[in-house]
Curated annotation (Swiss-Prot):
Domain of life of the source: Bacteria
Catalytic activity: Hydrolysis of Ala-|-Gly bond in repressor LexA
Any one Gene Ontology BP term: proteolysis
Family note: Belongs to the peptidase S24 family.
Gene3D superfamilies registered for this protein in UniProt: Umud Fragment, subunit A, Winged helix-like DNA-binding domain superfamily/Winged helix DNA-binding domain
Pfam families in UniProt: LexA_DNA_bind, Peptidase_S24
Gene name in the database record: lexA
Protein name: LexA repressor
Length: 234
């Protein structure tokens, strides 16, 4: 049985992964649970890990995966179209996990265009051209138009986004404060967490090596928001 704080943290991680495709940072978890320090988050994560509810992903800074939810939580709010929770991050040789049959596989994935590279670091030239297409599990997608970008740089590593990852982006020009977005600044595109601060827009990295950049609201154009990622092993 989980304590109230353990349950709150587990559900926060679960919901954040569903919304953005990546686990929240320790700072975000601390803020969400209204704790005074990260040490409390460390203790809660260790307790959840020992009880088999979450696991840490190897070779990914502070990245977590929800393995299971408490019985009452899964019964009350099962993911749409699925009998059990499935993480939004798929890792493997470049293809989605195998389905039960070839027919099922054809129905459960969608070919999305890879439009180029996106900077997780210093902004690079805006993405313009389709390079190839990538099969993406339908479980990662919802309604709307989506596309894929290859990550270049290390500024989002504490959000579990590594150099060479393929991020799945839902096309759109709006985002909620705290979401990870593709932001166009002038003629350059970057992948960052967007924060709305008064009349300004902050683009935050998830790596202490990089500074938060502040812009006026008319200087940042949202091109879409992160819904998941795929990792290829070569």
């Amino acid at each position: 049985m989980l304590t109230r704080k353990q349950h709150e943290l587990l559900m926060f991680i679960h919901e954040r992964i569903k919304e953005t495709g990546v686990s929240p940072s320790f700072d975000e978890m601390k803020e969400a649970l209204d704790l005074a320090s990260k040490s409390g988050i460390h203790r809660l994560i260790t307790a959840l890990e020992e009880r088999g509810f979450i696991r840490r992903l190897a070779h990914r800074a502070r990245a977590l995966e929800v393995v299971k939810l408490p019985q009452q939580a899964t019964a009350a709010a099962p993911p749409k179209g699925r009998g059990a929770f499935r993480p939004q991050v798929f890792e493997g040789g470049g293809a989605p996990p195998p389905a039960a049959s070839p027919a099922a596989a054809a129905n459960d994935s969608r070919e999305l265009p890879i439009l180029g590279r996106i900077a997780a670091g210093t902004p690079i030239d805006a993405i313009q051209h389709e390079r190839e297409r990538l099969p993406v599990p339908e479980a990662m997608l919802g309604a709307g138009e989506h596309y894929v970008l290859e990550v270049q740089g290390d500024s989002m590593i504490e959000a579990g986004i590594l150099d060479g990852d393929y991020v799945i982006i839902k096309k759109g020009d709006t985002a909620t404060s705290g979401e990870i977005v593709v932001a166009l600044v002038g003629e350059e595109a970057t992948l960052k967490r967007l924060r709305k601060k008064g009349g300004s827009i902050a683009l935050e990295a998830a790596n202490p090596k990089y500074e938060t950049r502040i812009f006026g609201p008319d200087q940042v154009e949202v091109q879409g928001k992160l819904v998941g990622l795929i990792r290829r092993y070569h």
